[in-house]
């Protein structure tokens, strides 16, 4: 917080700066996490990313309220979406869904266990594509949704929350990622595409790639 002020970032970011550390800083005795506006104060926020608009909840949203680190992957997905049926699991703000819609996907299904996330996704779809009927959203557990869905998709996005925030949870996390990806592969049509991610710090790139290869089915493509 003091660093933000001392570097004069208030002059760089013209509209507002929201400092959020209560749920993001690791616990240490000498740290005092707190949230609050350093500049501005509006909670009605719409951000623009590559020409698309997104409602963002800085205050109550997960972490920063919008995962900017995925913007290039969202843009990449848009290039593969044309004419495809797309399933966006753990959709949160619906970022991948919005890009798939602009990429002319045949249909887009968004799934998240949080009703608030589904509401936010629907708002972002309507903000960019008012009245478009290609999109449907479901507030449901990801594993249960994959179990009950008989249809297969051309493209699936898996962007779950962290399964392991520390090394002690690594084994269970790897099992969870493998189970999730196995189920996703079962719902992908032959020749389909899987966008799969891990934000678990304890899971290395090598661990993740290995479990993806193990999860991949042996059916011919």
Describe each PLM feature range.
Residues 107-112:
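Conserved SAM-binding motif I beta-strand of class I
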Residues 179-215, 219:
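C-terminal substrate-binding/active-site "lid" region of AdoMet-derived donor-dependent transferases
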Residues 93-105:
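Conserved SAM-binding loop of SAM-dependent methyltransferases across substrates and taxa
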Residues 7, 11-67, 75:
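Non-catalytic substrate-recognition/targeting regions of SAM-dependent transferases
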Residues 153-183:
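Mobile active-site "lid"/loop adjacent to the S-adenosyl-L-methionine
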Residues 2-13, 213-221:
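Single conserved hydrophobic/aromatic residue that forms the stacking wall/gate
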Residues 119-151:
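S-adenosyl-L-methionine
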Residues 83-89:
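Conserved class I S-adenosyl-L-methionine
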């Amino acid at each position: 917080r003091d660093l933000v002020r001392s570097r004069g970032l208030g002059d760089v970011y013209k509209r507002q700066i929201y400092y959020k550390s209560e749920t993001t800083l690791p616990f240490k005795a000498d740290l005092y996490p707190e949230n609050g506006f350093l500049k501005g104060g509006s909670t009605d926020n719409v951000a623009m990313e590559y020409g698309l608009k997104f409602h963002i909840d800085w205050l109550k949203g997960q972490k920063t309220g919008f995962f900017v680190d995925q913007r290039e992957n969202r843009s990449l997905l848009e290039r593969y979406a044309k004419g495809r049926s797309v399933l966006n699991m753990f959709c949160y703000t619906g970022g991948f869904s919005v890009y798939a819609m602009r990429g002319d996907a045949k249909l887009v299904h968004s799934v998240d266990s949080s009703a608030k996330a589904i509401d936010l996704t629907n708002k972002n779809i309507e903000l960019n594509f008012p009245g478009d009927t290609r999109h449907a959203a479901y507030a449901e557990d990801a594993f249960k949704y994959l179990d009950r869905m008989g249809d297969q998709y051309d493209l699936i996005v898996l962007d779950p929350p962290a399964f392991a925030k520390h090394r002690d949870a690594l084994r269970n996390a790897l099992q969870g990622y493998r189970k999730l990806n196995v189920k996703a592969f079962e719902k992908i049509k032959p020749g389909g595409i899987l966008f799969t991610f891990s934000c678990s710090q304890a899971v290395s790139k090598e661990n993740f790639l290995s479990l993806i290869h193990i999860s991949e089915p042996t059916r011919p493509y």
